[in-house]
Every structure is written in C-alpha cells, then in structure tokens.
Amino acid sequence: MDLVKQAEWNKELPKTWDELFDLAQKINSLNGKSGVYFGETDTWLILALSLERGGKLINEKGKVDFNNKAWQETFKLLSDFHTLAKMPAIKRSEAISSFYAGNLGILIQTSAALTQTEKSINFPLKLSKFPGVQSGGELPVGGSVVMLTNDKNKEAALKYIHFVTGEANAYVPQYTGYMTSNLLANAKLKDFYNKNPNYTIAPSQIELMGNWPSFPGDNALKATNTLWNYAEKLLMGTSTNYEEIAKQAQEEINALLP
C-alpha cells in the first residue's frame, strides 16, 4: 500500500479495470516505480477476463470463437496492460522480485502466493477482489479429482485424502492463501480471518466461482500454450493489434482441436 499512498490514491482500491489502469498510471509517475503486472504464465487469468464478461472458451461446435464481444474486450484489455498501464516487459519472476522490493504497485496473481508474499515484503499489503466482473459473469477456479481402486494398497492414500479434504483443510488458507474447499473448515477460520483480512478476499467471491474450462482433445496443452503465447504478445507490447492477434490465436488453436 506504500506506493498506492505515494500515488495519492485516497479512495477504495479499484473495482473496475479503468480504475486499475488509472491507479497504475499514477504509480508509474513515481520515480523508478511500475504500476501493474499481470502475473501468471498460465491461461486461467486470461480466461477470467473473458468469463467475467460472460464469455466461453469453447462454443457449441467444440471450437474457440474469439470474434465476439467478450473475447474481443479480453484481447483489448490484454493490450491495454501495455498501452495504457505501461506494464513492464519482464519475466514473472522478475516482477515478483520487483513487487517484493516495493518497486511494483499492483501484482495480479493467484491467491496461493499470499502467505509467501507476506513473508517476503516489508510494507503493508492489501488484497482486492478481481475487477470488472459483470452481471452473470464468473471467475474460473481450480479443482481436483480423486480416483481410487479397491486395491488395499490405496488405503493409506484414501485416509490422507479424507484428512486433507476434511477439517484439516482449514490449514490450506493459513499456509498458502488458497480458499478452503470445506465449509466446516471455513467456519472454524473465523478468528484467523478477523486477524488476517487479506485471506477473506478469495472466499468473499464464492458466488462468482465457476468452472475452469479446458481445451478438448489430445492437443489441449498445446492449445493452452498457444493462447498464452498470443496473449503475451499483447502484454509485452510485441503487438498492439489485438484484433489480429485474436484472429491468429483462434485459427491456430482451432487447428489443434478435434
């Protein structure tokens, strides 16, 4: 929050992307400081930009369609990080180090990094909800699938699964920042949440949580990497033509899908 105060942002943290870019620009004006970094090298944050607008990853034909309002706005927003917010063209690891050092004002990344971040900084940290979620929009969240056979050798694994998904799940937010997936465990975290308000941000958005969609077929990972590679062109400023980038990404990804 030190850079936010230095930038004379004397109001609530941004609730929209326009407000976030405005704050980023103010921080950019401080000597040697950067405003914002879109901090993941996976596609879930990119998906969040579309899903919060009601977008879908795969259409009814099993293909991607980036030529619609939600996805066009998403690709433009990715470009805006470079053109408007002047996001530094650096690696994620460098951005995290910059944030730890107090030289980066806003870092957009997974809540799983919260505990480590708190241990690594010497300034007040405040989390904010994901900006710009529109009516009917969702945010993608992760999940796990457990599959066991009747093999007796799996007994120990099953006991462990019962443990980590039960009341012990209360340790998950305390040691990572992730939201617990167990409502009973969550109820027991009241005192922890009162003392650590940053950890309430993730569960406070539970009504917005939706599926984390993936690409179909054997080339799902290649398609995922392709989407990120095109998004990175906009984030890093290699290209500012978001419409052409969206078109190229759609063509290349659909060629990979069944």
Residue ranges and their predicted role:
Residues L20, I27, S50, S98-I106:
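Hydrophobic residues within well-ordered alpha-helices
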Residues F21-K26, K61-A89:
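Glycine-centered hinge/linker elements that transmit conformational signals in sensory
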Residues K15-D22, P88-A101:
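Short helix-initiation/N-cap motifs at beta->coil->alpha
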Residues Y175-N229, K233:
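Long, aromatic- and glycine/proline-rich binding clefts that accommodate carbohydrate-like moieties
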Residues L30-S34, A101-Q109, F123:
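Alpha-to-beta junction loops
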Residues M1-E12, F21, F38-E60, L139-M147, ...:
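Periplasmic solute-binding protein
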Residues A7, D80-L84, E118-S181, W212, ...:
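Extracytoplasmic/periplasmic substrate-recognition and gating elements
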Residues D42, R92, Q109-L114, P203:
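Beta->alpha turn/N-cap motifs
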